[in-house]
Amino acid sequence: MADTRGSTSSGGGDDRGREGHDDFTGGGQYNRYHRILEAVPSPLVRRENGVHHQYPTGLIHHPSSTMPVAPCSYVPRYTMVPTSAMLPLQHHHRQLQISQENFQDRVPSNNVAAPHLPSNFQDLRPMCNGPPFMSYGQTASNRNVLYQNLTPYSFNAWASNNMPRNPVYTSYHPTAIEDPHATPFHINNHDTDQGFFTVSTSFRVDQSFVHAPSPFPPVSSSSRSFSSAQISNGPIDAKKAKKSDIKDQPIVLRRSDTESEKNDELDQTPASEPSSMSHNSANSTIRFNCREYRVILRKELTNSDVGNIGRIVMPKRDAEAHLPALHQREGVMLKMDDFKLETTWNFKYRFWPNNKSRMYVLESTGGFVKQHGLQTGDIFIIYKSSESEKLVVRGEKAIKPNVIMPIVDCSCKNDLNNSEECGFAISLLTKKT
């Protein structure tokens, strides 16, 4: 028996011991490995085991119960577990010594190894060090990952790398780190045990102590809330200021503007009425004696007369009877004194041939129309002296829409006194409806 256990007393014992050792490490290692697997019962991971494994005693603190967390509905997630493969010799040797080792977990916050504590994973060690985990560890070691030897860190490496992340719990409130006595809220949602697949479907490991940066600024009680109108006050005020600079000048719509568009003529902007126009007819009697002057032409101005062309069409009958006779088309220049202003106007009097007839016009009247502010419907009057044959021009504004052509008569206090200077009296002729 001593020879069989490895004694060196006899050659036969040495041969049997060497042969048994060769059976374990040589050609019989495959059969030996499967016998060990058959001898290990399949563990059932219960709820309390999952809780202990999520939060080992003294290593990871439970999150704070005061943190508001929305409950998540259970959705089964299945993870493909790698199949068993041929293991190196050092893994078989370490698998036999698993009961002699202690687990060391690294805290994710400071990456410092925790002290050796009594093992709380006796029921999970056969599962964590089985062929599925070893094959996964071997694959990870070939990829030059941090955990090259997965025996002490097999479960942590498998859970953090192979398990699906929970998209809800990404970070915890800082009180989860400071409160070690808080009740755990990570529990399995299963009412019944589901065997080995309980780990791969319901077990969840969250990196609770790794702070996830937020793209939004922190909100505090001292933060002020602004409305959209308050935020956009600056640009809106600037735009209003720019628009106000443009719109400061008032827009005045005149009657001649709309009427000139109908006749396809340029705009005629009337000038302001001079202060001398507010004088009564008594001032005019000083310059003109109504006994000497008489009205030879009256016309109600049209759109073309007050247009920018500066031309007034004269009534044919009155023009041929009282104005100078025209022998040439080019016409003649006529000087007329202003009835209200101390100025003299130079107009060109000419005619146009029109179907074997003539149309008489008075040109260069734009300045006179602007000076008196004449518009469509106003009255244009020409006086002629019976003694000197001087011409006097007058423009009168229409007082009412239904009043046309004021009648200008000579008014004297004493008609029998011929030496008395008489003034002009205006009487309105109402339009017949």
Swiss-Prot record:
Annotated protein name in UniProt: B3 domain-containing protein Os04g0676600
Cited PROSITE patterns: B3 (PS50863)
Pfam family, one: B3
Main location: nucleus
A GO cellular component entry from the record: nucleus
Known role: Probable transcription regulator that binds specifically to the DNA sequence 5'-CATGC-3' of the IDE1 element found in the promoter of the barley iron deficiency-inducible gene IDS2.
Composition-biased stretches (Basic and acidic residues): 13-24, 237-265
SMART domains, per the entry: B3 (SM01019)
DNA-binding residues (ranges): 297-399
Keyword entries, A-Z: DNA-binding, Nucleus, Transcription, Transcription regulation
Compositionally biased residues, Polar residues: 269-283
Keyword Cell inner membrane found: no
Bias type Low complexity, positions: 216-229
InterPro entries with a match to the protein in the record: B3_DNA-bd, DNA-bd_pseudobarrel_sf, LEC2-like
Record PANTHER family: B3 DOMAIN-CONTAINING PROTEIN OS04G0676650-RELATED, B3 DOMAIN-CONTAINING TRANSCRIPTION FACTOR ABI3
Location of the protein in the cell: Nucleus
Single GO MF annotation: DNA-binding transcription factor activity
Region: Disordered, residue numbers: 1-29, 216-283
